[in-house]
Amino acid sequence: IDIIDGMTTKPFGKGPFYPGIGVGGHCIAVDPEWLKAASIKAGFFPKIIQHSRDTNNSMPNHTIRLLEKLVNLRENKVAVLGVTYKGNIDDPRESPFYDIKKILLQKKVDFSVFDPWYRKENTVDSIDKALDEAKIVLLVTNHDLFKEKITVEFLKAKEIKIVIDGRNCLNKEEIIKQGIVYKGIGR
């Protein structure tokens, strides 16, 4: 965490990045590839850059495998919350959402999508409707709306059984205390 805190002192960008469901955007997901290509051209293969990209690219699959260990996905509706690659922006470029969506479609899983900042992928028009009939919440993006709205009371009222917190921004202890299965990606 000290390293992450130190990274917030950089004179560009918007805040820190934490381990989670994957990275996106026009820089973090792309710039390492340029550095890797330049390194290879200079005669050096940057294993750590490749390993980092492989790890980040595998997070959507890891997330779905984690869910499959808990429940039969075809028998449980999933509420996918968030499309953009980070909270409180309307930029979906390189977001892990797209890999999550592709996997869920391939597996023929019933799911809803809601993002208050980027509505082009929404299948419903509110977080309330996204959770209707869902048993699983899969949080992809840490929008403030989600952090405020996804309370234990809300989850209980919607009869949610499992929460996959892809950004580690929800109240883990309170969720678990209520008997809801909680898994944080990157914890």
Each predicted region: which residue ranges?
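Structural/interface elements that position substrates and couple domains in central-metabolism enzymes
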Residues: 1-187
